[in-house]
C-alpha cells in the first residue's frame, strides 16, 4: 500500500471516533510518514521504530500493532553497534582480506565508554559517495557473519543482525517475541495470485525485492516466505489474508479491484480494532475497576519512587536522625516535619528512600502513603490529592470510603481528612506515615497565603512529612507561617564530594556507560565540589553521550547554564524552531499534552511545517501532517527531562524539571511567542481545523497557497452521551485566556450553556467555578460575574439533588432570566440557549418561563457546609475575614470568607462547643465545650496555645450555663458552668481564682462588669451575688426586689452602664447592678433572648413571636418603637447592623428578617436560613452569618445594601397565605405588621400597589380569576369579598356562629360554588353573574362534621358535593343534595390539601407524611397512592390538576415540585425550587406558583414523548425513594357500580392497565 495512506485514512478516523466514545485516545504511529526515503531506512529510524513498538504494547489497552505484508521483504541494515567479542570474531575472519578489514575499520570506531566496549558505526563524511561503499560494507559483514555462524562462533540471534530486514525486526519485536500478543496485534497479508508467473515482468518487479542491478532478490523472497510461515505457525489468529488477481496496473488507485481491496481492508481494520478495544474494556469491567483511578495513582507514585532511589546514595546519617524523630513522636501529638533545601538538592530521592525504609523505622505494619506532588493530575491540586489519600488510607485500614456527599465539596473533603487522621490514631495499632514531596508543585499552595488543609498537629501514630524548596518560590515561607515550631524543619544539605562521585558512578553503571580518565577529569573540572544531585544529573545526561573517541564541549558550571546548554544542543540537532515550538507547547499547556495531541498541534503550526518541508514536499496532496519521526527523535534526546503524568486516564507529557521550565519560558515564550503557542493550542482544543476543515499554508518548495486537511482529532464537548471531552474542558479556557481571545472565551466557554453543563456534569460544580475564577480577573465583564454568582447559588441544589442537565439549565435560567434583557451579550444568550435546550428535551421536564430563583446580586454570599454535626457557636475573627464555628461534635472550623474555604480545623474538644469568644483584634479565640475544657487558639496559625480543664459539674440534672468573658486589659478569662466560676490567666493558663456556688440554687446568668471590677451572678431563685473580678472575693449578696417567682432565662451585660439586663420566664426584663435592680419592662411571654448593639445604645428582647427594641437613656433603657417586630414562629436570635440602622432577627421557621430601625421597623427583606431553626446569627462588618444546631450548613449574607431596592424586588410574604390574580400579575397576602390588611403586590413593578382593610386578622385567601373576586377568610368568621375591578366595594358573608374562625375556603372549578370551612361546619354558597359584580347567594347548604377533630382542607364541586379532610387524616365525600357523608380511606397524618380535577371526576389529597392519593369520585376509592421517603421530606404543601387533567402538580415542603401522571400514576419529574411553594395554579400548559422567597414561578410542563422514561430526571437524587401503588381497574369499576366499558373510560382519559404492579423508584 502507498505509504502514508493507512495512517490517516477514513478507517483510522472511524477507530478514533469509536475510542473517543469510550473515553480512550486513539493514536496512529507511522514514523516513516512525511520523511525522505533516505531517512526512512537509516539506523536511527529503525531503532526508534522498534522503541515505538515497545511503547505501543506498553501503552495500548487495545490494538497495539498492525502489519501490512505484501511481497517485499525490505532492506537489511548492517548493525549500528557491534559488541567487542563479536567484533573480534569478525576481524579475525577479515584478516586475510586487508581491504575489507580496512573498510570495516573505517566505518566502525571503538567506544571504550560503553560497558562492555562497543564498536559504533560512523556516519559518512559530508560529500562522500557512500552508497557503493555501504553496499560493499554490508556484503563484507554479511559474509563474515555467515562464516562465523557456520563455525559456531556467533549465535543465530547475532547472525540475524546482519540478515534481517527492518520489517522482520519490527514484526519480531512486536509479535514473534511473545506468545501472548494475539489480542492486540493484527497482520494483513496481501497475496497476488499468479504473481510467480509474471515475476520477471517490469511491472511486477515494483512489488518485490530487487538487487542493485534490477534483478529479482531471491534471498529476500525466501526470507519473506519464511517470515510469513513463522507468523502463521505462531499466531494464526492475527492473520487476515487478502487474495488479489494479477493485473498489470494492480497498484493503480484507479483500478476497481485495487479500490475494492483497500475498502475491504479498511473495514476489516475498523472491525478488528474495535473488537480488540471492546474485549479489553470488558475484561477491565469484569475485574472491577471502580477504584482503577486510585490504583493507577498509587502505582504511578510507586514506580516513580523506584526509579528515583535506584541511584540514591549518602544521607544515611539524616535518615537515621529522621527515623529516631519519628519513633520519638509516634506516641504523642506532634507537628509535621518539613524537609527543605534548594532545587535539585535531593529532597525527592530522600523522601522516596524514607518511604522505602519506613517499615524498618516504625514497624512492618506501618502504612506508608507517598505522593510526588505535581507528577500526576490528582497530585497537582489539593482537591485530588486529599481525595486519593483519603481513599487509600480508608482501604488500608478497612474504614468506610468517603461518601459522595463529602466528595461533592472540597471543604468537606478537608474535614473528612482531618477526622480520618484522628480515627486512625485512635485505633492505637498501625502507624500511618504520609509523605508529600515537592509542596511547591501543588497548585493551591504555590501562590497561597496559607495551606488550609494542612494539619498543624499530627495525632499519635500519624506522621506527616513534607518537602519544599528554599529560595524565592515562597512555599517554604508559607509553611513557616503556619508551622511555627523551628524543630519541625530539617535542612537537606549537599552531598560530599565522594558521595557526588558515587552518584555519578551509579548513574553510569545503570546506563551501562563509563568515562575515560580524560573525560572524568573534564567532568569534575566542570563540577568542583558539586554536591547538588540535580546538577550532577544534568552533567551525567551530557556525559553519558560522550564516546571515548570524541572531544566533548566543556560542561556549564551552574544549573541554569547547563539547562541553556541542553537547549543549545537540542537546537543544533533538531533545529531551533522545532525545539522552541515543541517545548513551548508542552510548557504552555495547562496539564501537559499527550503525544497524539502534540503531533496534532504541530500539524496545525504553519511555521513548523514550513520549516520541516523546506527541502522536500509532503507525500500527500490531500493532507498535511507533521512527520512524527522528527518528534520521536527529539523526545529521545529529551529523555530524562520529559515526564509522563497520568491525567484523566491518559498519559500526558510535561517538563520534569523546574529549571528547564523557566529556561523554556525565557528562551522561547517571551513577548508574542507565548500568545502564539496558546493560540495554536486553542485552535486545536476548540476543533477549529478538525473534521475535514482545511487550512491554508504556503510551503517553500511549492510557492503557492495550499488548502490542506490537517487531519487532527475532532474536539466535541461530548464523545458520547456519558463520555465528556475532559481534555478540551480543562485546556481550552486556559489557552483562549492566555492567547488574548477573550471574546471567544466569553462566547464559547463562559457564555455557552453546552459548555457549562458539560463541565459541570463531568467535573462537578467546583471545577466549573474554578474555570470562572481563572478567567474572571482578566475579563472586565459584569455579566461573567453574574453567571459565576448564579453558579455559586446553584451549589445547594447540586449537593442535594446531584448534578444533571435539567437541574443546571433550570437553575441558571430561573436565576439569570431577570437580567436577560439588560445583559443580552452573555446572560441573554445563555438564557436563549437554555430555552432552546428545553424545547428539544426528550424527557418530561418543567420549563421556566421567567426568573423565580434568587438572582445573583442579592444579599446571599455563600452557602457553606462541613463534614460535621450541627453548628452551636459562631463568631467573626480578623477584620471580618475569618469566621469561627463550633459544632456539636466538638470540631472548631476557621473559615476564610474571602476564599470561602476552611483554613484551620481545630480538633481539641471532645464535646459540643457551647461558646466562642474572639479577642486580640480577632487573632485569638477562646472556646468552651460540654467536655468542661477551655481552649485558646491562634486563628492565624491554627495552633492551640493551651487547654484548661474547667472542672464543671457532671450532674446532667443541674442547669448548665456556658459563659465566657475575656478581660484583655488584665489578661484574664472568666468561665461559668453549673455552680462554678473560674478565672484563668490568659498567658500562663494558671488559675486566678475559683468560686463555688450553691448546687441547690445554681447561677443562671453571669457577667463581668469591667468598669466596677465586679463579677455579677443571678441565681435561679433570683439571688444577686457580687464578687471581685480580681480576687474572686464575695462583696455582697441580695434578693432581687423587682422580680417575684420568675426564673432567669437569659441576660446580657451593658458595660457602659455597669448593668446586667436579665430576662425572665414570665416576661419580665430587669436591670441588675451592684446598687440593686429595677424592672425595665413586662413582656407578654417569656424572654427568649437579649442582645445589645455594639455601642450599647440599643437593646433587643425576643419573646414569643416578637422582638421589642429599647433605646438607652439615663435610667437604663426605654422603648424605642411602639410596634414590635413580628415573625410567624418563635423568635430565636437577633443581631444589630453596623450603624444601628438595621436589626436582623431569626426564628424557628428558618426565616431571617431584616428590619430598618431608621424607618421605624420597616421590613426590608426576608431571607431563607438553612432549612432549620435560625438559632445563631453573627455579624462581622456588613456580613451576617446564620446557622442552626440542626444543620451542618451555614449561610453568609452581605447586608451592606439592604436599603437599596433589589431588581426584581420580591414580595415580602412570610405567612404563605398568598393568592394570585390576572394570570400572575398581582399577588395578595396579609400585610407585614398588620394582618388586618391585604397587600396587593404588582409583580411587574416590584412594589405594593394598594392594600385592603379587612378589620380582622386574615386566615385564608382565594381568588376567582374569571369572576374577578378576592375572598378573604377572617379570624372573626367573616368572609369579605372584594371585586378586583372595584376594590372600594366589598361583600360580607357572616359566620354561622359568632367568633368562629375560618379554617379554609374552596371555589369550584367553574367558580359557581364556594365552600367555607370552620372547625366543624361547612357552608356551601352559590356564585352567579350580576351587574356590576357577581352575586353570592346562600348559604345553599350547611352541614356539621360531627367529629371531635377539626377541618383541615375542603374542596367543592359544581354538583354540591364536598370533599373535606380532618386534622387526624380522615377524608370524606359529602353529598349536599342527599345529606350523605361517605368516608374515604384515611391518611396516616394531617391532610394538607384536597384538590378537584377540572372535569370533577378525580380528587387528589396530600398529607404531611408526603402521601399523595388520587381518588376516583365515582368509585369513592383511590386509584393511585404515591409515598415519598427521604431525609429531607416534610410532607405535602399544595397540589393541583393540569388544565387537561392529565397531570397533577404537587408542591412539597422540602422545597420541590413534582409532576405526577394521572393516566398511570407515574412520577414524571421532580424539580427543586429552593423555597416552599404556597399554592399551585394551573395554566394552559403548566402552572404559576408563589413561593416563600417572594417570587412567582411560571413554568410549562413539557412531555414530548408519551412513553418518555421518568427515570432520567431522578437518577441523581440522593437518599430518596418514591413508591406508587395502583388499584386494579376491575375493583374501581365494581365499586362504582358501572359496567366495565373500557372504551368509555378511555375516552375520558383515565385508562389504566389492569393488573398493574406497584411501581418503586429508588433514587440513590
From Swiss-Prot:
Biological processes annotated in GO? negative regulation of NF-kappaB transcription factor activity; positive regulation of gene expression
Q: Where is the NACHT domain?
A: 335-661
Q: Which one of the record's GO molecular function terms can you name? A: ATP binding
User: Superkingdom of the source?
Assistant: Eukaryota
A cellular component term from Gene Ontology for this protein is:
cytosol
Q: Matching InterPro entries, A to Z? A: Apc4-like_WD40_dom (IPR024977), NACHT_NTPase (IPR007111), NWD1 (IPR043365), P-loop_NTPase (IPR027417), Quinoprotein_ADH-like_sf (IPR011047), WD40/YVTN_repeat-like_dom_sf (IPR015943), WD40_repeat_CS (IPR019775), WD40_rpt (IPR001680)
Identify the residues that bind ATP. Answer: 341-348
Q: Which Gene3D superfamilies match?
A: P-loop containing nucleotide triphosphate hydrolases, YVTN repeat-like/Quinoprotein amine dehydrogenase
One Pfam assignment = ANAPC4_WD40
Function comment: May play a role in the control of androgen receptor (AR) protein steady-state levels.
Know the name of this protein? NACHT domain- and WD repeat-containing protein 1
Gene that specifies this protein: NWD1
Amino acid at each position: 500500500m502507498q505509504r502514508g495512506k493507512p495512517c490517516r485514512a477514513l478507517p483510522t478516523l472511524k477507530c478514533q471516533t469509536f475510542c473517543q466514545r469510550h473515553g480512550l485516545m486513539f493514536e496512529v504511529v507511522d514514523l516513516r510518514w512525511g520523511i525522505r526515503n533516505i531517512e526512512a531506512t537509516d539506523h536511527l529510524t529503525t531503532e526508534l521504530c522498534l522503541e515505538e513498538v515497545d511503547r505501543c504494547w506498553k501503552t495500548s489497552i487495545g490494538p497495539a500493532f498492525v502489519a501490512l505484508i505484501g511481497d517485499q521483504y525490505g532492506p537489511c541494515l548492517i548493525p549500528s553497534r557491534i559488541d567487542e567479542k563479536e567484533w573480534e570474531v569478525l576481524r579475525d575472519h577479515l584478516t586475510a582480506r586487508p581491504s575489507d578489514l580496512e573498510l570495516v575499520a573505517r566505518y566502525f570506531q571503538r567506544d571504550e565508554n560503553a560497558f562492555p566496549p562497543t564498536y559504533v558505526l560512523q556516519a559518512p563524511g559530508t560529500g562522500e559517495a557512500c552508497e557503493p561503499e555501504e553496499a560493499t560494507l554490508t556484503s563484507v559483514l554479511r559474509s563474515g557473519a555467515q562464516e562465523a555462524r557456520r563455525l559456531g562462533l556467533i549465535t543465530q540471534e547475532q547472525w540475524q543482525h546482519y540478515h534481517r530486514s527492518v520489517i522482520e525486526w519490527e514484526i519480531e519485536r512486536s509479535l514473534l517475541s511473545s506468545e501472548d500478543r494475539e489480542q492486540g496485534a493484527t497482520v494483513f497479508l496481501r497475496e497476488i495470485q499468479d504473481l510467480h508467473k509474471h515475476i520477471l515482468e517490469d511491472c511486477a518487479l515494483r512489488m518485490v525485492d530487487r538487487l542493485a542491478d534490477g534483478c529479482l532478490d531471491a534471498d529476500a523472497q525466501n526470507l519473506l516466505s519464511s517470515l510469513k510461515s513463522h507468523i502463521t505457525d505462531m499466531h494464526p489468529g492475527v492473520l487476515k489474508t487478502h487474495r488479489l488477481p494479477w493485473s498489470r496496473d494492480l497498484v493503480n488507485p484507479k483500478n476497481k479491484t485495487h479500490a475494492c481491496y483497500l475498502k475491504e481492508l479498511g473495514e476489516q481494520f475498523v472491525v478488528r480494532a474495535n473488537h480488540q478495544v471492546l474485549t479489553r474494556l470488558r475484561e477491565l469491567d469484569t475485574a472491577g475497576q471502580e477504584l482503577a483511578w486510585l490504583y493507577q495513582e498509587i502505582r504511578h507514585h510507586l514506580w516513580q519512587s523506584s526509579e528515583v532511589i535506584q541511584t540514591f546514595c549518602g544521607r544515611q546519617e539524616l535518615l537515621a536522625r529522621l527515623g529516631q524523630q519519628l519513633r520519638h513522636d509516634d506516641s504523642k501529638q506532634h507537628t509535621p516535619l518539613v524537609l527543605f533545601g534548594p532545587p535539585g538538592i535531593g529532597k525527592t530521592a530522600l523522601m522516596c528512600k524514607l518511604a522505602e525504609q519506613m517499615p524498618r523505622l516504625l514497624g512492618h505494619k506501618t502504612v506508608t502513603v507517598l505522593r510526588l506532588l505535581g507528577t500526576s493530575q490528582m497530585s497537582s491540586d489539593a482537591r485530588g490529592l486529599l481525595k486519593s489519600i483519603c481513599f487509600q488510607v480508608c482501604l488500608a485500614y478497612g474504614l468506610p470510603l468517603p461518601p459522595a456527599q463529602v466528595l461533592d465539596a472540597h471543604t468537606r473533603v478537608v474535614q473528612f481528612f482531618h477526622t480520618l487522621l484522628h480515627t486512625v490514631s485512635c485505633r492505637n495499632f498501625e502507624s500511618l506515615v504520609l509523605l508529600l514531596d515537592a509542596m511547591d508543585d501543588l497548585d493551591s499552595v504555590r501562590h497561597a497565603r496559607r495551606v488550609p488543609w494542612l494539619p498543624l498537629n499530627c495525632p499519635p501514630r500519624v506522621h506527616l512529612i513534607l518537602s519544599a524548596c528554599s529560595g524565592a518560590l515562597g512555599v517554604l515561607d508559607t509553611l513557616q507561617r503556619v508551622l511555627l515550631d523551628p524543630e519541625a524543619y530539617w535542612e537537606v544539605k549537599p552531598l560530599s564530594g565522594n558521595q557526588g562521585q558515587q552518584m555519578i558512578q551509579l548513574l553510569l553503571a545503570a546506563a551501562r556507560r563509563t568515562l575515560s580518565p580524560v573525560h572524568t577529569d573534564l567532568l569534575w573540572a566542570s563540577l568542583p565540589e558539586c554536591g547538588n544531585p540535580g546538577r550532577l544529573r544534568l552533567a551525567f545526561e551530557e556525559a553519558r553521550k560522550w564516546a571515548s573517541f570524541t572531544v566533548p564541549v566543556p560542561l556549564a558550571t551552574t544549573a541554569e547554564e547547563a539547562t541553556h546548554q541542553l537547549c543549545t544542543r537540542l537546537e543544533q540537532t533538531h533545529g531551533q524552531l522545532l525545539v522552541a515550538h515543541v517545548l513551548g507547547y508542552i510548557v504552555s499547556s495547562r496539564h501537559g499534552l499527550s503525544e497524539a495531541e502534540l503531533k496534532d498541534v504541530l500539524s496545525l503550526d504553519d511555521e513548523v511545517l514550513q520549516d520541516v518541508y523546506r527541502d522536500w514536499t509532503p507525500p500527500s496532496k490531500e493532507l498535511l501532517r507533521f512527520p512524527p519521526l522528527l518528534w520521536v527523535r527529539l523526545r529521545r534526546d529529551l529523555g530524562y527531562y520529559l515526564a509522563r503524568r497520568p491525567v484523566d486516564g491518559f498519559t500526558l507529557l510535561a517538563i520534569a524539571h523546574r529549571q528547564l521550565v523557566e529556561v523554556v519560558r525565557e528562551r522561547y515564550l517571551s513577548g508574542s511567542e507565548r500568545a502564539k503557542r496558546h493560540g495554536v493550542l486553542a485552535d486545536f482544543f476548540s476543533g477549529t481545523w478538525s473534521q475535514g476543515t482545511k487550512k491554508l499554508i504556503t510551503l517553500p518548495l511549492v510557492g503557492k497557497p495550499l488548502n490542506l486537511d490537517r487531519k487532527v482529532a475532532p474536539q466535541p464537548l461530548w464523545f458520547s452521551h456519558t463520555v465528556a471531552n475532559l481534555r478540551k474542558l480543562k485546556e481550552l479556557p486556559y489557552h483562549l485566556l492566555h492567547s488574548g481571545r477573550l471574546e471567544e472565551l466569553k462566547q464559547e466557554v463562559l457564555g455557552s450553556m453546552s459548555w457549562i453543563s458539560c463541565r459541570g456534569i463531568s467535573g462537578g460544580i467546583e471545577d466549573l467555578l474554578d474555570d470562572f475564577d481563572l478567567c474572571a480577573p482578566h475579563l472586565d465583564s459584569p455579566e461573567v460575574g453574574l453567571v459565576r454568582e448564579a453558579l455559586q447559588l446553584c451549589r445547594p441544589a447540586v449537593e442535594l439533588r446531584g448534578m444533571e442537565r435539567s437541574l443546571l439549565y433550570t437553575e441558571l435560567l430561573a436565576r439569570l432570566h431577570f437580567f436577560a434583557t439588560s445583559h443580552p451579550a452573555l446572560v441573554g444568550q445563555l438564557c436563549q440557549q437554555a430555552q432552546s435546550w428545553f424545547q428539544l428535551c426528550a424527557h418530561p421536564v418543567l420549563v421556566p418561563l421567567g426568573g423565580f430563583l434568587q438572582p445573583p446580586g442579592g444579599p446571599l454570599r455563600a452557602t457553606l457546609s462541613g463534614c460535621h454535626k450541627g453548628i452551636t457557636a459562631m463568631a467573626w475573627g480578623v477584620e471580618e475575614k475569618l469566621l469561627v464555628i463550633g459544632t456539636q461534635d466538638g470540631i472548631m472550623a476557621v473559615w476564610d470568607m474571602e476564599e470561602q474555604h476552611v483554613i484551620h480545623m481545630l480538633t481539641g474538644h471532645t464535646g459540643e462547643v457551647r461558646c466562642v469568644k474572639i479577642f486580640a483584634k480577632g487573632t485569638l479565640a477562646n472556646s468552651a465545650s460540654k467536655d468542661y475544657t477551655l481552649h485558646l487558639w491562634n486563628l492565624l496559625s491554627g495552633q492551640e496555645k493551651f487547654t484548661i480543664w474547667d472542672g464543671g459539674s457532671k450532674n446532667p440534672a443541674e442547669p448548665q450555663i456556658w459563659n465566657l468573658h475575656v478581660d484583655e486589659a488584665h489578661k484574664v478569662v472568666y468561665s461559668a458552668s453549673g455552680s462554678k466560676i473560674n478565672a484563668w490567666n490568659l498567658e500562663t493558663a494558671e488559675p486566678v481564682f475559683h468560686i463555688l456556688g450553691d448546687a441547690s440554687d445554681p447561677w443562671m446568668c453571669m457577667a463581668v462588669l469591667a468598669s466596677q471590677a465586679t463579677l455579677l451572678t443571678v441565681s435561679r431563685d433570683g439571688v444577686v451575688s457580687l464578687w471581685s473580678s480580681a480576687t474572686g472575693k464575695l462583696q455582697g449578696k441580695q434578693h432581687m426586689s423587682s422580680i417575684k417567682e420568675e426564673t432567669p432565662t437569659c441576660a446580657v451585660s451593658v458595660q457602659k452602664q455597669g448593668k446586667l439586663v436579665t430576662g425572665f420566664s414570665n416576661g419580665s426584663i430587669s436591670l441588675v447592678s451592684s446598687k440593686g435592680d429595677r424592672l425595665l419592662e413586662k413582656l407578654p411571654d417569656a424572654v427568649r433572648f437579649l442582645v445589645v448593639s455594639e455601642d450599647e445604645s440599643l437593646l433587643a428582647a425576643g419573646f414569643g413571636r416578637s422582638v421589642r427594641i429599647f433605646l438607652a437613656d439615663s435610667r437604663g433603657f426605654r422603648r424605642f418603637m411602639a410596634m414590635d417586630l413580628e415573625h410567624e414562629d418563635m423568635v430565636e436570635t437577633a443581631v444589630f447592623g453596623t450603624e444601628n440602622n438595621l436589626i436582623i432577627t431569626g426564628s424557628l421557621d428558618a426565616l431571617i428578617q431584616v428590619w430598618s430601625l431608621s424607618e421605624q421597623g420597616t421590613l426590608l427583606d426576608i431571607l431563607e436560613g438553612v432549612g432549620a431553626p435560625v438559632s445563631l446569627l453573627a455579624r462581622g462588618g456588613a456580613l451576617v452569618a446564620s446557622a442552626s444546631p440542626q444543620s451542618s450548613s451555614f449561610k453568609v449574607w452581605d447586608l451592606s445594601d439592604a436599603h437599596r431596592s433589589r431588581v426584581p424586588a420580591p414580595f415580602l410574604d412570610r405567612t404563605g397565605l398568598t393568592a394570585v390574580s390576572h394570570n400572575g400579575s398581582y399577588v395578595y397576602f396579609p400585610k407585614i405588621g398588620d394582618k388586618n390588611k391585604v397587600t396587593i403586590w404588582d409583580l411587574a413593578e416590584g412594589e405594593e400597589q394598594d392594600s385592603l382593610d379587612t378589620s380582622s386578622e386574615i386566615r385564608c385567601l382565594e381568588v376567582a380569576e374569571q369572576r374577578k373576586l378576592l375572598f378573604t377568610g377572617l379570624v372573626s368568621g367573616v368572609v369579605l369579598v372584594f371585586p378586583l375591578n372595584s376594590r372600594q366595594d366589598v361583600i360580607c358573608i357572616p359566620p354561622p356562629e359568632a367568633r368562629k374562625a375560618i379554617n379554609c375556603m374552596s371555589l369550584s372549578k367553574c367558580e359557581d360554588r364556594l365552600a367555607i370551612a370552620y372547625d366543624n361546619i361547612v357552608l356551601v354558597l352559590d356564585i352567579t353573574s350580576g351587574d356590576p359584580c357577581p352575586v353570592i347567594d346562600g348559604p345553599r347548604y350547611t352541614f356539621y362534621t360531627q367529629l371531635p377533630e377539626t377541618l383541615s382542607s375542603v374542596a367543592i364541586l359544581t354538583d354540591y358535593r364536598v370533599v373535606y379532610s380532618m386534622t387526624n387524616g380522615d377524608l370524606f365525600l359529602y353529598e349536599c343534595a342527599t345529606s350523605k357523608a361517605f368516608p374515604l380511606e384515611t391518611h396516616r397524618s394531617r391532610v394538607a390539601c384536597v384538590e378537584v380535577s377540572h372535569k370533577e371526576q378525580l380528587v387528589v389529597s396530600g398529607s404531611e407524611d408526603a402521601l399523595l392519593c388520587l381518588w376516583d369520585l365515582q368509585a369513592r376509592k383511590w386509584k393511585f397512592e404515591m409515598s415519598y421517603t427521604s431525609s429531607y421530606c416534610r410532607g405535602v404543601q399544595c397540589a393541583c390538576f393540569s388544565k387537561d387533567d392529565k397531570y397533577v402538580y404537587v408542591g412539597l415542603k422540602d422545597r420541590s415540585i413534582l409532576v405526577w401522571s394521572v393516566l398511570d400514576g407515574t412520577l414524571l419529574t421532580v424539580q427543586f425550587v429552593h423555597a416552599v411553594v404556597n399554592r399551585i395554579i394551573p395554566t394552559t400548559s403548566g402552572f404559576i406558583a408563589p413561593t416563600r422567597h417572594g417570587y412567582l414561578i411560571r413554568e410549562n410542563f413539557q412531555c414530548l414523548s408519551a412513553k418518555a422514561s421518568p427515570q432520567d430526571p431522578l437518577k441523581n437524587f440522593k437518599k430518596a425513594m418514591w413508591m406508587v401503588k395502583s388499584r386494579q381497574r376491575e375493583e374501581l369499576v365494581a365499586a362504582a357500580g358501572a359496567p366495565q366499558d373500557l372504551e368509555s373510560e378511555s375516552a375520558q382519559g383515565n385508562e389504566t392497565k389492569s393488573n398493574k404492579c406497584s411501581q418503586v423508584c429508588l433514587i440513590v
